[in-house]
UniProtKB/Swiss-Prot annotation:
Top enzyme class: oxidoreductase
Encoding gene per record: dapB
Disulfides per UniProt: none
Function: Catalyzes the conversion of 4-hydroxy-tetrahydrodipicolinate (HTPA) to tetrahydrodipicolinate.
Name of the protein described by the UniProt record: 4-hydroxy-tetrahydrodipicolinate reductase
Active site: 161 (proton donor/acceptor), 165 (proton donor)
Main localization category: cytoplasm
Metabolic or biological pathway, per its Swiss-Prot or TrEMBL entry: Amino-acid biosynthesis; L-lysine biosynthesis via DAP pathway; (S)-tetrahydrodipicolinate from L-aspartate: step 4/4
Family assignment from sequence similarity: Belongs to the DapB family.
GO biological process: diaminopimelate biosynthetic process; lysine biosynthetic process via diaminopimelate
């Protein structure tokens, strides 16, 4: 049985992950649930707070993270919070020999480098991904092929999320951009939206458009526009369960790895071949 701690436990993703783990009691046990410092619900069982009944894991706060880790000894910590607190969580978990599944997005390059150094130094295993949905990763894999075969077409990326999402563009859109640029046989330049008299579109442009509204879980479309035809590759998530299922697979994948390496969902889903 894999013992799991979740930070961001009362968030949309955190609570969904806990519910799914608890539905698979033979394989997983939620031993810790962490949320923001001074949370008024501290001490109340996380199961009671998310509507599934007592599971024996009282809500704790981030300022007590190391104490709770030492008491519960999780195998894997799952983090869906925000960049700055996540980096601190990675440090504490790594120093206490706890493997990681990170779904937080919006990191700076410096924050990513810091986490990589911490994970390598402490010789733990980690999965870090902008999107854990299985379909999205097939979407990413298909983008590799399209960029290689029709990369001379004009390329645009459009993403839409719910009105509460704090970062833009989404981590998934940025990952799509990275995959495209890594597989193009030409120069490219990312731009973010267009406004005013911008002139004709240049061949190098890959423009990302971020839309926000309503309760959209996550829509991503990459457009390859050529002369006389247009190919659009789209993934739409209708439920967070799409992401949660991938997170659970990542927990199982990383649980016993102690090698100082960072893996991604291509590794988890065996898509790297």
């Amino acid at each position: 049985m894999i013992k799991v701690m979740v930070t961001g436990a009362l968030g949309r993703m955190g609570s969904s992950i806990i519910k799914t783990l608890c539905e698979n009691k033979e394989d997983y046990k939620v031993v810790g649930a962490i949320d923001v410092p001074n949370h008024p619900k501290k001490g109340i069982d996380i199961g009671e707070l998310i509507g599934i009944g007592n599971i024996g894991a009282p809500l704790e706060t981030a300022d007590n993270l190391e104490k709770v880790i030492k008491e519960t000894r999780p195998d894997v910590l799952v983090d869906f919070t925000a960049p700055a607190p996540c980096v601190n969580t990675v440090k504490i978990a790594s120093e206490n020999n706890v493997n990681l599944v990170v779904g937080t997005t919006g990191f700076t390059n410096e924050q990513m480098e810091e986490m990589e150094e911490i994970i390598n130094k402490n010789n733990i295993g980690a999965v870090i991904s902008q999107n854990y949905a299985i379909g999205v990763n097939i979407f990413f894999k298909t983008l590799e092929l399209l960029a290689q075969k029709i990369g001379d077409y004009d390329i645009e990326i459009v993403e839409m999320h719910h009105k509460f999402k704090k970062d833009a563009p989404s981590g998934t859109a940025l990952r799509a951009l990275e995959i495209i640029q890594n597989n193009l046989n030409r120069d490219s330049k990312a731009i973010y939206g267009r406004e005013g008299l911008v002139g004709e579109r240049t061949k190098e442009e890959i423009c990302i458009h971020a839309l926000r509204g309503g309760d959209v879980v996550g829509d991503h479309t990459v457009i390859f526009a050529g002369d006389g035809e247009r190919l659009e590759l789209t993934h739409k998530a209708s439920s967070r369960q799409a992401f949660v299922s991938g997170v659970v697979l990542a927990v199982k994948y990383i649980a016993d790895k102690k090698d100082g390496k960072i893996y991604n969902t291509f590794d988890v889903l065996n898509l790297n071949e």
